[in-house]
């Protein structure tokens, strides 16, 4: 099922853990609508701006999958409102900065990105059609969350330190 021009339901529900453990990771109709919103409101604008394919690392997660991976059942992933992704050749911090300044989102988390490796980690972003989006921006280093994104120096569109 095509969710938007460049994104399919299959890539938003794919999970190696679900496959390995025989977990049904099929979203309901409301979850699919939320996934469509994430695609149209966030992923398509990001793809258009960077003009590169996006690799989804985690999209929808059923309650059973959340339990299997130790994620909260209240996660926005469990409602189809959140996605984790990367763009090959684009530092994740650059993607996060662009999202923070250019699209409507509920929560944006730069996860496991280190100053000495701006391409490391991944971007988590969510969208909530039902209410006002919080525009919450966090950085997670694997131990704790900090408000905002790390300060980085840029030159010619590249992170320099």
What are these regions (language model features)?
Residues 87-161:
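Catalytic cores and adjacent binding grooves of peptidoglycan-active enzymes
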Residues 55-57, 82-86, 124-126:
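Structural recognition of the beta-strand scaffold that forms the well-ordered cores
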């Amino acid at each position: 099922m095509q969710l938007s021009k460049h994104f399919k339901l299959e890539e938003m529900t794919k999970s190696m853990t679900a496959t390995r453990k025989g977990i049904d990771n099929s979203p309901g109709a409301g979850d699919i609508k939320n996934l469509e919103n994430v695609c149209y409101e966030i992923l398509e604008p990001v793809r258009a701006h960077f003009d590169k394919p996006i690799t989804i690392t985690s999209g929808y997660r059923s309650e059973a999958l959340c339990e299997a991976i130790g994620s909260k059942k209240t996660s926005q992933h469990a409602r189809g409102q959140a996605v984790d992704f990367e763009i090959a050749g684009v530092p994740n911090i650059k993607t996060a900065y662009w999202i923070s300044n250019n699209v409507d989102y509920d929560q944006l988390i730069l996860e496991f990105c280190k100053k000495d490796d701006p391409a490391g980690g991944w971007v988590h972003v969510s969208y909530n059609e039902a209410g006002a989006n919080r525009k919450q921006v966090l950085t997670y280093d694997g131990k704790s969350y900090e408000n905002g994104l790390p300060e980085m120096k840029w030159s010619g569109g590249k992170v320099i330190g």
